[in-house]
């Protein structure tokens, strides 16, 4: 049962392709073919942009959480779909040139190692991630990989960004307010 099909994402700034993510792996990310099909891959997550979801699947899995807008709304929905036994498929038959985050001169951002959003957006990212850590349908592999990554990125933004105070305020507020989100 397929819940959604999403395009191959290419960063227009770096022309780097984003691999389709499998969170049951603790290190590395690679494309794994879907039932041996060429150009179609298993994924544990597809970004909302360009992804096709049949309405009957939305009826079964439920809609995307409005209170997660603007960050990780797709991540949370994909986790629910996978927990209900659905497959997510990434395809090379559709390409989407899509930059995630803001432009920056920092080499880590330019290289695509990390995405840097505006300080205001980090509130939503922090809140929603911390909320997802408490969900039983969020894969353990994702939690084990994402929590240290989130912590390191938050520290980097709060210590080394030119807007570190704004980042610190938004990240810490997001962490505090994660408890206030509905189940």
Residue ranges and their predicted role:
Residues 7-8, 24-44:
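Short, flexible, basic/aromatic active-site loop/helix in glycosyltransferases
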Residues 51, 57-62, 67-97:
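A short, conserved alpha-helix in the catalytic core of glycosyltransferases
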Residues 91-113:
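Active-site donor/metal-binding and catalytic loop motifs
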Residues 134-183:
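Non-catalytic, C-terminal membrane-associated alpha-helical segments of glycosyltransferases
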